[in-house]
A protein has these predicted regions:
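Structured secondary-structure scaffolds
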Residues: 1-212
Length: 212
């Protein structure tokens, strides 16, 4: 069977906008061995492209963006509380059976297909449906330090005690995976260079391959 290449619309995080910051912050990380930080990871940062965030799959974290059919209006939801408020708002404005199953307890399962049953309403009164895409699973991994404590919605003090990490150990292959997404999200979410992601110690495992 032939391999077919065709263009698709996608959502991106403009990581190139903070490239210089990420490069500088990388120099504050205590890499072991140091050559991983200056070489493999440093080179990856120097040649980074914008992060393709969206995926065309069924299983995963849905992209929390709703759009009108004409694509002129959209909303990005930032929390479960905001989503449930928008669910009720849409039911009041659009009427009928809009979101009838989610008006009392709110939405309990944020995954497909349930989240795609939700209709929201735009500022001009038009119905909005969620875009079909999911979020890159590496975003979930990079968001782990925040998500595990439901930060910033609660556990702020607990989060402050454990972030940033004192020590992270993973395989060298994670320079393009988990290490990168941790570094990218940490750089994007903090407001000043001094508050950016600064792991106090980070080491990589070396894979030894043996022929049997």
């Amino acid at each position: 069977k032939p391999i077919i290449y065709y263009p698709l619309d996608a959502w991106f995080i403009k990581t190139t906008a903070v490239k210089d910051r990420m490069v500088e912050l990388n120099k504050t990380i205590n890499w072991k061995p140091a050559s991983t930080g200056t070489g493999r990871f440093g080179n990856w940062l120097e040649n980074m492209v914008d992060w393709n965030l969206s995926r065309s799959r069924f299983w995963g974290t849905p992209l929390p963006i709703w759009k009108t059919e004409d694509g002129e209006e959209e909303i990005c939801i930032g929390s479960v509380e905001e989503l449930n408020n928008e669910i009720k708002k849409a039911a009041e404005v659009l009427g009928g059976e809009t979101n009838k199953h989610y008006l009392h307890e709110g939405i309990l399962d944020l995954h497909k297909p349930y989240v795609d049953e939700i209709t929201l309403v735009s500022d001009s009164g038009k119905p909005m449906k969620r875009v079909a895409d999911l979020i890159d699973v590496w975003f979930d991994s990079g968001a782990m330090p925040y998500a595990q404590w439901h930060f910033p919605f609660e556990n702020v003090e607990t989060f402050a005690k454990s972030y940033p990490a004192d020590f992270i150990a993973e395989g060298v292959d994670q320079t393009r995976g988990w290490f990168y997404t941790l570094h990218a999200l940490g750089s994007l979410l903090k407001e000043s260079v001094e508050e950016k992601l600064k792991e106090k110690g980070l080491t990589t495992q070396v894979f030894n391959l043996k022929k049997y």
